[in-house]
């Protein structure tokens, strides 16, 4: 029961990232628009008083604020999209359902617009009168104040309706409403039922949330910030931190803005106070991230690099530099945290405690800095330094330096004292055992604990992604012995790095689990193994040319541990400068991943090359890519393979660095040319 709930919470947590991802853009508009009204800035730059500039800044401020004002609706649509695999019908159903749910609650409880503003009648101060109202005006609908929770509930229900009814068949005379068209209809019915239920169930829940909010924020806020920091970091490995911090950011606490509107949630209150130009009282649950993200974790990365074995320092240095810079600039810490989370849990325990103290120290010092994305340098500039007189952002720098020193010496001491297997200090890998192509999916399934142990099965171009029921049944060493370059464990989620064949293994495993294919007999396997084997290996010398116009970098500098660690093979990193990827040699297209972000090629001499366009671009679901070729198509060197929208990738992917990997280098030598500036006619590698 718990594991089932945990799996669902993981999916909800991932779904919440979609609406949260909108906030940085809205926050930037709001921050810049507000900064252009700042009196001190206007004194320095009087041209900001120009009517056109004032209008532009007002538009920017309003454009950013409207996003924060309508977060519940965005959470409804975003949650539905995330849980329904990105289908737009689910988003439409969530939008319709959210409106109907609110209208239903308003009618059942006879809420009117007069009720919404009755809190102000007879009150001495609006802020006192509207402190904890139970009602709200949502998109012009007088209804209960359910906040982002209402949006999440309706989004999850709309996704459930989609997954349940998207392929429903109806009688011929109702055929027009069959399939996906039925989803908004059934969601409307579910929304009415939900509205009626919440009309009676939500008020006591709301009272409980208000009581909890008052207790946490008013009884001992200092202790609360410390506990918040510890729990928030502790949930990172399980992917549940988004669920945990959402009530603090979007619901707990209240503030009445200058327009007389009630604003709830630490992050939303900070943004409202930014716009109103008043002293900041919010930010207790965001500010604590800045010292350890900008200073502490990069120092920890240096400690890990320092303790790597000499022969591994170059690779580890590239990984740690990339991860440390990412944490400093953007506040994205997972690449760095996951590098030591599972191999050295004691380090993560130290990190969690220090994160808690960071929130506590920032609160005690009265530093109040908001954020929309994460606690990196970019947010620090926008929400801290631009408002330094109100946020006290300058204090982050000396505090951060202290945290950098503490992180470095604690990590360095723990690594040496406990002989921790941090990156660059790992044991040698297990030797790979033979498994025929036909038998490999069966062996992997067995190593994962059998089909009864598989909760969810997926793959991308580089790794097999499996959510298991019981992690103790998984034979990690066995998976590595079957050819996986590495196995990453995140909670009950296993990622086995099988390279380009990962997707095929997934499809075969799915067919095995559904009974479509059966295990080959031992006789067949023996015959396969005893007959003269078919080797896919390069014959002679193969010249490999640049896959486009751009820059060549060492593979160790690619910002992804799987590629930089050469888990899939050796090669180079390519930074494209034009949106066209071309064939590096004459050969055949062997694979085009469904999301178009990766291409597998085989040269006429048998050299297999994987071109993986960007990092984590599988999550773009094909957006930004246009394939110009088909699987099994013959191509010539410099022939265009893929058109890429580089601007879109830069905005939506962690990096446009494109690993180019030779995946079958066994018994062959790879010579990498000393080339930096590349074009399709330039030789960059040779396989001998």
Curated annotation (Swiss-Prot):
The chain crosses the membrane at residues 12-32, 81-101, 137-157, 182-202, 223-243, 284-304, 315-335, 340-360, 364-384, 395-415. It is an enzyme of class 2 (transferase). It is a multi-pass membrane protein. It comes from the Bacteria. CDD domains: PTS_IIB_glc. Gene3D superfamilies: Glucose Permease (Domain IIA), Glucose permease domain IIB. The EIIC domain forms the PTS system translocation channel and contains the specific substrate-binding site. The EIIB domain is phosphorylated by phospho-EIIA on a cysteinyl or histidyl residue, depending on the transported sugar. Then, it transfers the phosphoryl group to the sugar substrate concomitantly with the sugar uptake processed by the EIIC domain. The phosphoenolpyruvate-dependent sugar phosphotransferase system (sugar PTS), a major carbohydrate active -transport system, catalyzes the phosphorylation of incoming sugar substrates concomitantly with their translocation across the cell membrane. This system is involved in alpha- and beta-glucoside transport. This is PTS system glucoside-specific EIICBA component. It comes from Staphylococcus aureus (strain Mu3 / ATCC 700698).
